[in-house]
């Protein structure tokens, strides 16, 4: 299984266009040892030629330009993107579909809940019907494994997660199973297994056992502390209110990962998170625990 980190930041990217927090200011001024990051998305392949996107970042055009494997190379106009899987309907995970309209029709896998959001509050399916048939919905049934024809060696098991639906969802304050997914991806040829969950609000015992099966954990790294947005002067909500488990504190992501084997990589990192500063004590804690911070262009093979 080939995994390409197309984007590794949370919504807004890093630096965020309207943010002057310590991290964003330091990166722009060159006083912070850190790397710019685009909004999160990954690509998966079982052969290096045909690819599946997991989420479609608003930065998808630049991400394709940075990854030759996705660029047109077989015809005057074509793409190696054979399908897309949406783990939720958050604006930073599906707006990239608009930028892919010239390549429609696209095969899009998502749950009934996500499909509802993208036909009502943010009606991408209806909008894109006008481009060569638009998006062909392939329903994801919770806990039922599925395969995508273009990458037959990969088996996807969708796992419902506790998180939050986006503000435009008709059930924003009434969570439903299927609003947010994690994916357990297994390669039948190599035996490699990936657990991918860029939006993860809570880890219970059954989910922990699922995570224990994975050779690589690619998980929510949004915030270091639950009140980080408030502390940085960038917002008024706790991470837990937005559906993100912070890294620090009792029951935080560090504590969860400490009890698990396999490669551990944080993704979907908010611009305020001190782990972006490569010289920060928080980053040093990750290094000491053997936890990596995803970066754009990172490759993982399982």
From Swiss-Prot:
InterPro entries: Metallo-B-lactamas, PQQ_synth_PqqB, RibonucZ/Hydroxyglut_hydro. It comes from the Bacteria. The keyword Chaperone does not apply. The keyword Plastid does not apply. Pathway: Cofactor biosynthesis; pyrroloquinoline quinone biosynthesis. PANTHER family: COENZYME PQQ SYNTHESIS PROTEIN B (PTHR42663:SF7), HYDROLASE C777.06C-RELATED-RELATED (PTHR42663). This is Coenzyme PQQ synthesis protein B. It comes from Azotobacter vinelandii (strain DJ / ATCC BAA-1303). The lineage of its organism: Bacteria, Pseudomonadati, Pseudomonadota, Gammaproteobacteria, Pseudomonadales. The gene is pqqB.
């Amino acid at each position: 299984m080939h995994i390409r980190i197309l984007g590794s930041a949370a919504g807004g990217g890093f630096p965020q266009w309207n943010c002057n927090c310590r991290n964003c200011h330091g990166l722009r001024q060159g006083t912070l040892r850190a790397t710019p990051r685009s909004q999160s998305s990954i690509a998966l392949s079982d052969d290096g030629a045909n690819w599946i996107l997991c989420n479609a970042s608003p930065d998808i055009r630049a991400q394709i330009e940075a990854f030759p494997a996705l660029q047109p190379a077989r015809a005057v106009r074509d793409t190696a993107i054979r399908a897309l899987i949406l783990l939720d309907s958050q604006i930073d995970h599906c707006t990239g579909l608009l930028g892919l309209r010239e390549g429609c029709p696209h095969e899009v896998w998502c749950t009934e809940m996500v499909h509802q959001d993208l036909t009502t509050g943010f009606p991408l399916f209806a909008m894109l019907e006008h481009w060569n048939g638009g998006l062909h919905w392939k329903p994801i049934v919770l806990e039922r494994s599925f395969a995508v024809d273009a990458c037959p060696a990969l088996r996807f098991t969708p796992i419902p997660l506790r998180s939050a639906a986006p503000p435009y969802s008709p059930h924003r304050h009434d969570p439903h199973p299927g609003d947010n997914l994690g994916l357990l991806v297994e390669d039948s040829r190599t035996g490699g297994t990936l657990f991918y969950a860029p939006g993860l609000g809570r880890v219970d015992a059954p989910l922990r056992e699922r995570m224990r099966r994975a050779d690589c954990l690619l998980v929510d790294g949004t915030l270091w502390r639950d009140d980080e947005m408030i502390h940085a002067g960038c917002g008024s909500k706790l991470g837990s209110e937005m559906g993100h488990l912070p890294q620090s504190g009792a029951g935080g992501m560090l504590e969860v990962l400490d009890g698990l084997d396999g490669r551990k990589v944080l993704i979907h990192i908010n611009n305020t998170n001190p782990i972006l500063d490569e010289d920060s004590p928080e980053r040093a804690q990750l290094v000491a625990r053997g936890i990596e911070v995803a970066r754009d262009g990172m490759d993982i093979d399982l």
